[in-house]
């Protein structure tokens, strides 16, 4: 029997490492790379290249930073999860999740509340737990991934 298909919303390769590893146990994982919040096309490209070092199962949402006017993290998270759910519906995925909870700087409770408010097809997570963030650092170094030192968001 085949695994359910899950679309994982990601913004960088390092954050996706542990998420893909853990989710792949129960799901057929495809990554959705979305980076409208990123401050430049160059940063978008560097992060996308890093993700391809992890997996080739990637859907790339085109970069549209020119319309970016988000003022806080909660709104950014909401937009990226709404966008992911649109892809889920359009492409027939069973579930969706996000790798954002890998970061020690992100509030997993808030992220999961937002995801659950969008759809019951959202799979909650806190990938930083059980040394997830530490493991993501190790894996990204092994894969020689670009590791950014900021979320990429430029507030207006």
Residue ranges of each PLM-predicted region?
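Nucleotide-activated chemistry modules centered on ATP-dependent adenylation/adenylyltransferase
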Residues: 1-156
